[in-house]
Amino acid sequence: MSVIKMTDLDLAGKRVLVRADLNVPVKDGKVTSDARIVATLPTIKLALEKGAKLMITSHLGRPTEGEYNEEFSLLPVVNYLKDKLSCPVRLAKDYLDGVEVAAGELVVLENCRFNKGEKKNTEELAKKYAALCDVFVMDAFGTAHRAEGSTYGVAQFAPVACAGPLLAGELDALGKAMLKPERPMVAIVGGSKVSTKLTVLESLSKIADQLVVGGGIANTFIAAAGHNVGKSLCEHDLIDTAKKLAAETNIPVTTDVVVGKEFSESTPATIKSVSEVTDDDMIFDIGPDSAKALADIIMNAKTILWNGPVGVFEFDQFAKGTEIIAKAIAESPAFSIAGGGDTLAAIDKFGIADKVSYISTGGGAFLEFVEGKVLPAVAILEERAKA
C-alpha cells in the first residue's frame, strides 16, 4: 500500500490536523479506559517535536449530528491530555471558520460528530476541515472503513493528506499477515455465529494454510461433520456452507468439547468426546485434546491471524481452550496479529499483550480489511499519494 507517511514530512510551522480515534468510555467527566488515547500519544508527541501547529479531532459516542451535547464532549480527553503532555492543550468548540494555533501547542477540536454533514461526508464540511490545515493526518484505523467528513472528505481537499504512525503501522502489519504472509499461515476465527464471519472465513480460506474455527462458529462445523451439538448455539441453516468450507480448506475438526447444561457462570463443566454430546448439552469450549492439537499447529506456524475466542472465556470453567490458544500464540516465534473486541479482552485476561506481534486497534475496520474490502479512508490516501 502506497501512502504518504507523516513520519516522512517536514511539519515545522505547518498547521497539522490529525483525525485520531479518541472514542473512549467516560464516566462522571473522567476517562475510564485510556487505551485509545495512549495509542495516539506517540503521534501527538512526534508532531509536536516536528514543530507542528497541532490540531486533533475525533468522534466520541453517538450524539445527534449537528447538535452540541455536553455528554459527548471531548473535554474529559482534553483534561487527560493536559496531565500527560508538557505543552499547552485546549479545547476549541467553534472551529469550522478557522482556529488560531501556535507552534508547539495542541488544540483539540470538539467532537466531529457535532458537525452537520459529518456522517454523510458533505463537500461543504469536508472543505471547511481541509481549510483548517496544511497537512491532514489520518490516524484512526478504527474508523477507516467509514467514508465520513473527518476521515475521507477532508483527505480529498487538504493540501497534503497522509497516514499517521498508528494507521501506517496497522496497514504494515495487516499487509504482512494478509498480503505477503510467511508460510505456513494459520488463521483462528472464533465468535458466536458463522453468519457474521462468513465473508471473513471465505476470504481467509483462500489465504490461510490452516483455518481454525472456535466458539459458536465451531458448533456449526461440528454439526456439519455429523455430530450432535445438543442445545448449543448452532446455525443449522449454514451447515451446507460449513461443509463446503471444510471441503475446500484445511479446517481441523474438534475431537473433544467442554459442555454445560445452561449458559451461566455457575454451571458445572464436563469434558466429553465430540461423539458423546447429548441433546441437553451446550458446548462452551474446545476440550484439552483439541486445544493441544491446535496449539501444536500454532507453534509450527510462521504467520498467525487471530480473531475471536474459541470458547466462553468469560466463565473460567470454559476459558481453558482460549487460554491454551493464547499462550501458544504468545510462545510461537511466528508473526502474529490479533484484532476484535473479544480477542483483545482475552489477550488482557491471559496477560499476553506484549507477546503478540501486533494488536489491531480497529474492530470493524480490521474485519473489513480481512474480508478483502477496500477501506475508503485508506483508498483516498493512496489516491492522493499517486497525485
From Swiss-Prot:
Binding site for ATP: 197, 314, 340-343
Record-level Gene Ontology MF annotations: ADP binding; ATP binding; phosphoglycerate kinase activity
GO CC terms: cytosol
The protein's enzyme class: transferase
Keywords assigned: ATP-binding, Cytoplasm, Glycolysis, Kinase, Nucleotide-binding, Transferase
Gene3D superfamilies: Phosphoglycerate kinase, N-terminal domain
GO biological process, one term: gluconeogenesis
Catalytic activity: (2R)-3-phosphoglycerate + ATP = (2R)-3-phospho-glyceroyl phosphate + ADP
Residue positions binding substrate: 21-23, 36, 59-62, 113, 146
Primary location recorded for the protein, binned into one broad class: cytoplasm
Cellular localization per UniProt: Cytoplasm
Pfam families linked: PGK (PF00162)
Pathway: Carbohydrate degradation; glycolysis; pyruvate from D-glyceraldehyde 3-phosphate: step 2/5
Family of this protein: Belongs to the phosphoglycerate kinase family.
Protein name as annotated: Phosphoglycerate kinase
Native source species: Tolumonas auensis (strain DSM 9187 / NBRC 110442 / TA 4)
